[in-house]
Regions:
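Short, glycine-rich nucleotide/cofactor-binding loops
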Residues: 122-129, 340-350
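A glycine-rich helix N-cap at a beta->alpha junction
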Residues: 167-192, 392-407
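C-terminal non-catalytic interaction/assembly regions of soluble proteins
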Residues: 141, 351-483
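Conserved, well-structured core segments that form the ligand-binding/active-site neighborhood
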Residues: 177-198, 202-327
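N-terminal amphipathic/basic leader segments beginning at the initiator methionine
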Residues: 51-96
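Short, low-complexity intrinsically disordered segments enriched in A/P/G/S/L with frequent Arg
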Residues: 2-9, 14-15, 21, 31, ...
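Glycine-rich phosphate/diphosphate-binding loops that line cofactor/substrate pockets in enzymes
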Residues: 101-117, 142-148, 326-333, 362-363, ...
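Short glycine-rich or small-residue beta-strand-to-loop segments that form or flank ligand, phosphate
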Residues: 115-126, 151-157, 218, 336-338
Length: 483
């Protein structure tokens, strides 16, 4: 993608029409792409289970949690079971890099370049960096880019920097030992380059180490995202490598409260369009995104998409929107959800995503139970302070209505939008008890106590939706995807 060009936000979101094809007859384009990667997908949703106890596994921390749900209710389990792990993921990765979508092969694209920057997800995301980085780096070096001129940037956004141990986990021990791997630091303004403003007025500060490189690559994965519709691609540029001033605007009520800035919404999502424009300004050249399958704590690769950033991401989103979409005919009386286990449920800050994913399918006045381990507690210091100092969701929303945006308020704002609609219950054993009173819902010491509270006073035969992997399933009422 070349430098410059008009700042017309409508130019960056063309072709993301995601209205699903019938489940038994996917689009020919999607099936052709799937077949080339060695798999065929088919979606299925589990029907109701009536009036008997049910043993269910939930993604929770690294090991999961198996719970017996009480009899007397209509359970509907929503699982993205149709994403099948690739039989030969290494070959699929090689093929994606050598036969990319709407782009020359990566090695050809890198020829003549003197430096490269690769943006990768931080420890809170299960991106398959360890599998993809070695063949990607090999092609850059084969094209003539010296190893010392390749920088791997961990796209932390406003998250904390990665520890040395985490860098090895993120990139793999060999890559971490032999290559330059550094964390983005959003608060260090001097480490960013100002690229101007977007058409809507967002000031764009992007990590200088990314912008100054000759070749700009992102490596991520695609899943439903609570504000952006779907993750991956442009998100690895901003907010991943953006400065604090940029991130605050992207997470402001301007975008947070837009009805189209939600899971599964992309074609007309204003935040998606904003990030595409920012990625264009930063000269985003090449993308590698994976779609992940489920596997009781493991997230094996289901598909690989590489190439020109917009075209490759569009193909990936089409795939994910098919295999992760699960629908209900009507809203549920209650929902049991998770934050998809490790690493997404490391902190309560990240675990909020499991609650927002459930909010779209619960009745007004219904109940949501979140199961999240939260071994690292609350999250960042700013989020912890906000949570501790705002025991009322209503007062919090009133206070931020006119005030300047502060770091991490957006996650609490998303939680408040849910608690205004539904009663939220929590089993979050890693969260210090001092925060229980500030959760805008009741926390319980055991999962059994939480489930008992969820089902108490519900009438016999009440409809309870169960989402064992929380935000990794795009749960909707009817065919609401692609708005």
């Amino acid at each position: 993608m070349g430098e410059g060009g008009p700042h017309d936000p409508t130019a960056y979101a063309v072709g993301y029409s995601l209205t699903p094809a019938p489940r038994a007859d996917m689009s020919n384009e999607l099936l052709r792409h799937d077949t080339s990667r060695g798999h065929r997908q088919e979606c299925r949703c589990y029907g109701m289970r009536y009036n008997r106890t049910m043993e269910t596994w939930f993604a929770f921390g690294k090991n999961g949690l198996s719970l017996e749900l009480p009899e007397g209710f209509r359970y509907q389990v929503l699982e993205a079971r149709s994403a099948v792990p690739l039989a030969d993921a290494p070959s699929a990765i090689e093929d994606a890099l050598d036969s990319p979508i709407a782009s020359p092969p990566l090695q050809e694209l890198a020829a003549g370049k003197k430096s490269a920057a690769i943006s990768v997800c931080d420890i809170t995301r299960p991106a398959p960096n360890r599998e993809i980085l070695p063949p990607l780096l090999a092609r850059l070096e084969a094209a003539g880019i010296p190893r010392e001129r390749i920088t791997i940037l961990i796209a932390t956004g406003l998250h904390r920097p990665a520890t040395e141990a985490e860098i090895s986990e993120i990139c793999g021990e060999q890559v971490a030992a032999k290559h330059r791997v550094v964390s983005h630091r959003a608060r260090q303004l001097g480490e960013h380059r100002y690229l101007g403003t977007t058409a809507s007025g967002t000031p764009v500060f992007i990590d200088e180490r990314f912008v100054s490189a000759d070749l700009h690559i992102t490596l991520g994965f695609i899943e439903p995202h609570l504000m952006l519709g779907y993750s991956g691609g442009r998100k690895l540029v901003a907010p991943g490598l953006a400065g604090e001033a940029t991130i605050k605007v992207l997470h402001s009520p301007k975008f947070m409260r837009d009805a189209l800035a939600v899971e599964g919404s992309i074609e007309d999502n204003p935040l998606h369009r904003e990030l595409l424009e920012i990625a264009h300004m930063a000269r985003h050249d090449f993308l590698v995104d994976a779609a992940l399958a489920r596997g009781n704590g493991r997230r094996p690769i289901a598909a690989v998409f590489a190439g020109e950033p917009m075209a490759a991401h569009r193909q990936g989103v089409k795939f994910v929107s098919q295999v992760m979409l699960e629908t209900l005919d009507e809203p549920a009386d209650a929902v049991i959800t998770t934050s998809a286990g490790y690493p997404l449920d490391l902190t309560f800050y990240q675990a909020v995503k499991g609650i927002t994913a459930a909010s779209h399918i619960v009745k007004p006045g219904g109940r949501i139970l979140l199961l999240a381990e939260c071994t690292e507690g609350v999250g960042g210091a700013e989020f912890a302070e906000l949570l501790a100092n705002h025991p009322s969701d209503r007062v919090f929303m009133e206070e931020i209505a006119e005030a300047a945006v502060v770091v991490d308020q957006w996650q609490l704002e998303k939680l408040a939008l849910v608690t205004a609609k539904a009663e939220v219950l929590f089993y979050v054993p890693g969260l210090p008890r001092q925060y229980y009173a500030s959760l805008w819902g009741k926390a319980y010491d055991t999962p059994q106590a939480a489930i008992s509270a969820l089902t108490s006073s519900l009438p016999r035969g009440a409809h309870i939706a169960v989402i064992p992997e929380g935000p990794y399933v795009l749960a909707q009422v009817g065919q609401a995807v692609g708005r």
